[in-house]
Structure formats: C-alpha cells, structure tokens
Regions:
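Glycoside hydrolase catalytic-domain context in secreted enzymes
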Residues: 1-2, 6-205
Length: 205
C-alpha cells in the first residue's frame, strides 16, 4: 500500500495527487472488505508500510534518519519514536512496519548509511529493540501496535567497493559476534518479520 500514499518521484505521487491519511485509511478498509467478501477463504490481508524514520506517507511525521537517532544514545527516546510511527501506520489501516534498519554501516561509501543506527552492534541492538518495543512488539491486539520488519538480513551494509547489493566478504566469527546480535536482540523484543538482504556472503547467496 505504500506506493499509493507516499510522495515520491518513483511513483509519481505528490502531495497533490497522493492519498491523505483519511483517504488512505478508507482505501485500506476497502481492501480489507474486498479480501474478506470476495475471496474463497475470506482471510483479511496484512498491509505493510515503509518506515525507516517515520511512516513514509503523506501527512505523517518525519523523524531524523537512523544515524541521527543513534546519536541520541537514548533507547527511551527511540521507543517513543516507535510508538508514534506505529500509531500513524495503524491509523491508516496497515499492520507491518518495514523497519528498523539493523545493518552495521562500516563502509561510508555505501549509499544507505543514513538508514542505519551506525557501526556498533551493541548500540544497534539496543536501539533496534527499543524501536521494536515502541512499534508494539507485534501484538496486534493492542490498539496501536505493528509487526516490525528488521532490515536487512545479513551483512548488507558492507558490500565490496561500497556498491549497494554487492557481495560481502565477512567471516563466520564476524557474523556471529557483530552482525547477528542486533537482530537477535530485536527479535527477543518482539520483532516478527525479517527482510532478507540482496547480497551474497563469502560467495554464498
């Protein structure tokens, strides 16, 4: 659903022709009604939204990027950000948040460094867990809770030559000591979804 409600040059949606929050909520409700009433099993659908530093949609709050939020060193503040994001996502009828980004940005040439919480696995893990908690820890029975999607599994931010999507040369020890712990901590906080990366690691896709 993100493609119809956010302002972006790729989708050619703007503040003038995109969906405002009220219309986005109506569109989400219409999709659910159709899925329930016009499909064989009548199963409601999950709607997902991009949320790297706020719900990426028209009429929502834009927070600092991940690298900016990490400069606060404040899990409490990041949890509050997560709560605000979850409320805006759920108020427009969606359930899944694409975020937080837990890539460890160790190569400044990589084009997505600003999405991350930086290079430190401990800080990334703490802030990632705080964001997941703020997003609602996947408990959709709560009024403003979403399912957090952790990005990008695994070792995505260290591509050869800094080129996005390129292969990563990372050994098993580095993976286990540095790249995996932030994901583990966020999963223990309640994340229910993980987005895979687009790279190969030591030649293994």
């Amino acid at each position: 659903s993100e493609m119809c409600i956010r302002d972006s040059p790729w989708t050619r949606k703007t503040l003038e022709n995109g969906l405002r929050p009220e219309l986005a909520a109506k569109a989400g409700n219409a999709l659910q009604k159709y899925a329930i009433e016009n499909t064989r099993l009548g199963i409601p659908v999950f709607l997902a939204e991009e949320a790297p530093h706020g719900h990426m949609a028209i009429g929502t709050t834009v927070f600092p990027t991940g690298i900016g939020m990490s400069a606060t060193w404040s899990p409490t503040l990041i949890e509050e950000v997560g709560k605000a994001i979850a409320k805006e996502i759920r108020s427009q009828g969606a359930h899944i948040s694409y975020g937080p980004v837990l890539d460890l940005s160790r190569d400044p040439r990589w084009s997505r460094v600003e999405e991350t919480f930086g290079e430190d696995p401990v800080l990334s893990g703490r802030l990632g867990a705080a964001m997941v908690t703020g997003l609602g820890s996947g408990d959709l029975s709560r009024e403003h809770a979403t399912i957090a999607t952790l990005k990008h599994f695994l070792a995505y931010a260290v591509p050869e030559g800094g080129q996005n999507g390129n292969y990563a040369s990372v050994g098993a020890r580095d993976l286990h000591e540095n790249f995996l712990p932030p994901f583990r901590e966020a999963i223990e906080a309640g994340a229910l979804s993980v987005m895979t990366s687009y790279n190969s690691i030591d030649g293994i896709p």
